[in-house]
Amino acid sequence: MDKEERKIINQGQEDEMEIYGYNLSRWKLAIVSLGVICTGGFLLLLLYWMPEWRVKATCVRAAIKDCDVVLLRTTDEFKMWFCAKIRVLSLETHPISSPKSMSNKLSNGHAVCLTENPTGENRHGISKYSQAESQQIRYFTHHSVKYFWNDTIHNFDFLKGLDEGVSCTSIYEKHSAGLTKGMHAYRKLLYGVNEIAVKVPSVFKLLIKEVLNPFYIFQLFSVILWSTDEYYYYALAIVVMSIVSIVSSLYSIRKQYVMLHDMVATHSTVRVSVCRVNEEIEEIFSTDLVPGDVMVIPLNGTIMPCDAVLINGTCIVNESMLTGESVPVTKTNLPNPSVDVKGIGDELYNPETHKRHTLFCGTTVIQTRFYTGELVKAIVVRTGFSTSKGQLVRSILYPKPTDFKLYRDAYLFLLCLVAVAGIGFIYTIINSILNEVQVGVIIIESLDIITITVPPALPAAMTAGIVYAQRRLKKIGIFCISPQRINICGQLNLVCFDKTGTLTEDGLDLWGIQRVENARFLSPEENVCNEMLVKSQFVACLATCHSLTKIEGVLSGDPLDLKMFEAIGWILEEATEEETALHNRIMPTVVRPPKQLLPESTPAGNQEMELFELPAIYEIGIVRQFPFSSALQRMSVVARVLGDKKMDAYMKGAPEVIASLCKPETVPVDFQNVLEDFTKQGFRVIALAHRKLESKLTWHKVQNISRDAIENNMDFMGLIIMQNKLKQETPAVLEDLHKANIRTVMVTGDNMLTAVSVARDCGMILPQDKVIIAEALPPKDGKVAKINWHYADSLTQCSHPSAIASEATPVKLVHDSLEDLQMTRYHFAMNGKSFSVILEHFQDLVPKLMLHGTVFARMAPDQKTQLIEALQNVDYFVGMCGDGANDCGALKRAHGGISLSELEASVASPFTSKTPSISCVPNLIREGRAALITSFCVFKFMALYSIIQYFSVTLLYSILSNLGDFQFLFIDLAIILVVVFTMSLNPAWKELVAQRPPSGLISGALLFSVLSQIIICIGFQSLGFFWVKQQPWYEVWHPKSDACNATGSLLWNSSHLDNETELDEHNIQNYENTTVFFISSFQYLIVAIAFSKGKPFRQPCYKNYFFVFSVIFLYVFILFIMLYPVASVDQVLQIVCVPYQWRVTMLIIVLVNAFVSITVEESVDRWRKCCLPWALSCGKKIPKAKYMYLAQELLVDPEWPPKPQTTTEAKGLVKENGSCQIITIT
């Protein structure tokens, strides 16, 4: 039974959830209704806040198959609950007449997943998701995704499009003809409208949601309570504050919704043409598109309303919305395996692996290319929220909660305050009963103590520091869409950097070329643009093997391609639409050298000149293009020289990959050494290759050939050497981070040795440090996976004869201190393939490699995300800085992701820098640290404020008195609010320091600081309260009491006689009240100064002019009304007149209190800096962070780091813990 009741949906995915079924129970509902009436609606609120309780209180468990309501719980660390109502989709609403037409409609794919099943099997397709007789499908919607009941798996499953389980063959064979109108209508019923609907909630809806926040409900309760106790002014002030807070909150929430709505509305409804089965073209709204529709891409381009795979023609697309890369990308049609080499036909289509053939939703198609008047067609694979843009919008609409120790501790602290309030509550009731106070008064006063202990202004106070930090970040050009992350950035202790465009300049400069002739390298050449090379295959490859296109007459495309094309100085011409329509086999793109290079290229006499005039029109047409793929690390083209019978294939890409696809006899013997020399110097190297194609390959065959048939058996032609200069600010920024004990890691798509060289140049790896390259090989031919360890020579050792000798001595890890993890003497470097193998087969090595991994090269976008996760698993707080191009996932996953791209892709990143420079990283960390320390200061201050006020009220309750309405008002508005909002204004300290701020409130030093201040304040308040009773002039105060000088007293009393009867009711005017009011008012200011920390994370508090001015003004004002009473002020604040001598005594109490408080707070700071490290080293305490614990372990591990030229093998059978053994190869 239990198995039937609890199931998992989205298994293995980020949004994996447990699902439980429930049915509504009438008797439970009746009991809950009664409870709601009895509690005056409070139970209803409680059930509104807790979906789990709501469902369990009103429903009974049921089998998921037949339930009315589902309860969902996330399986991550947050264990969040959601509930959703089951709805029924009736297929009878759509006129499906005969069973025959029904099976036709289903033969193209069943209801949930449009895989290609045989028609017979698909006849039962619908019954998987519904009861066939009634034609009804049960489903629920959660976070904008529909989950349908699937009978095959006996669970709910979300609707998939053509992006899963569909082979490339079937895309052409089964889906390229288009849908019938009936099938389209049927799918429309299931998939719904194709739109990413970001509904902007009405102000009323937002208001209700905001007002029903537990915090505002507590404030409402407080206001009602104070009003019944006749604290009208204070209640009114809190109401005004709450309204201001709600209005500002509503404004910012609605503004974000409107921004998001505008962002997705650009393509929400456009008119599109679709092909139907009978070749007819129908024009429909984009909202009516369903997976399987064949969409015609218009000539003049469009904004894509869905994800679609190209099956005809070529498109130039701007994908900046998704990737942040403003460079136009060329998309070609999906290779058709049925006309290609056999054996590839089973490859499944996947939008990620086939992204060069997929047009993504929200991206802009700038131009289309087509042949022989054919239409450019694409098959819709995903619609609505399933599209790549839809998923991005969903991640913004439903973000994962940020798990940060500070917030967890804040809740714990609030619980402590509630416990303290509970004690006060019981004390007040007992004290009032003993003094025979009326029941009504007891209830009001005992509840009042709760509202005093839990300060209503706490959430506003806590966010003040973050808001100010956000404003300061904006001033230095860093924009933030997730303000809560600013505090988390204060904890960052490791930052990952992308290389190209982040650490180095965006563009590459051509340094030179090194050609190969007869399998030997020629000497490097600087100039490619000369007559000698103009007709060489090498230059032809540079001229044709690229994805450049002309947009409005300007060459655009990949910056690397542009640089290469500009270096040869050729001209690119593209066919116009008219030409394409006229000629049967027009080549869409033609390249030719400039005229001045050609005639001079023939050093012939006049008589021969005429013969050369004809072929002087030397042109190469690009027949077919296989775009660059980061997975394959290469691109290739098929081209033909004008007049030649045979076509040529050209290829360029990563040297290792290109060399492996060339005939071994054409690759120079010293290829590896030459390549290594260039990469060690930090050059980016690209290899070129070429081969003549067979004459039987016609233009038409080439259009359908697979790239594997072209990309083999090539002739190696040589290398292009590109220079990627470091950005000017890079070394200085990295040095600042190292000084601050913040580790830096490079994650790049570039060659490993180039990356290691750049890491050395920028100071990420110091000259004396060792680099260990981990080369992991997957299991093959029955052999287990293994890692080969090589020690990369440092640059200085390259030409040194002792290079081999030095490799034999591994350098042992040296630490100055535990924290000083940056002082490691060795670094690991690996590429993406090795990283994947290690993750899969060597799980126990992953944490060790994370501790010292510095260079990760040739990393694919998803591997970057996996790396961030692996670092977070060893308790690093990880920052990621990239240009947004392919770092979206990593930027989102990191604790603090900062994108250097101003484009819309930055919606994936919590932070975006206006200036594309990594100097924003230390700035962000500094501001994060300042905001974090501000949060601590404010929290400590608010805690003290509530305890001081709580104790003042408890003392006064003991004599059946209380603070007056205007006394509360003065303390809460004039003192607390002013202090809280000005103490948060301290700007960040000028530089990053090695010390790191604490991450949580529950730390020894912090708790000791708060507790010591509480004891001091309680002590001095009690001293004043009890000492005033010992004074010779003291008596229980009554309207005619005269403790002051006669004249002063008469003046004061005469002005008050009218109001006495009213004031006596609450017994507010007495000597104890006046004493406690003055001492506590000073105490608030004393702890504000004590807690306003400056160095090393914030500027000193004397530089915070608003704070200094506010505190001085309040000090002077309180001191003035204490020493020189003003009748009108005393009347408003309900202060009684006390002798001048007692006023001076109070001043002395306050001064001693200030001295003790500030001295103790300073000593706590000193104790933390001096004694804590000593105590830790004496106690041999195990560090909390996994990486620090691991560092301690590795210090005594004789087997680590691995010795050079050794191999680590995975143990074949023990797979679950990924154990491994080390084998030394001699």
From Swiss-Prot:
PROSITE patterns: ATPASE_E1_E2 (PS00154). ATP binds at D498, K499, T500, F628, R684, D750, D883, G884, A885, N886, D887. One of its GO terms (biological process) is intracellular calcium ion homeostasis. The modification Phosphoserine is found at S98, S817. Residues 1-28, 50-205, 254-409, 470-940, 984-999, 1095-1105, 1165-1226 are cytoplasmic. Its main location: membrane. The chain crosses the membrane at residues 206-226, 233-253, 410-430, 449-469, 941-961, 963-983, 1000-1020, 1074-1094, 1106-1126, 1144-1164. Its EC number is 7.6.2.16. It catalyses: putrescine(out) + ATP + H2O = putrescine(in) + ADP + phosphate + H(+). The active site is at D498. Belongs to the cation transport ATPase (P-type) (TC 3.A.3) family. Type V subfamily. This is Polyamine-transporting ATPase 13A3. It comes from Macaca fascicularis (Crab-eating macaque). The gene is ATP13A3.
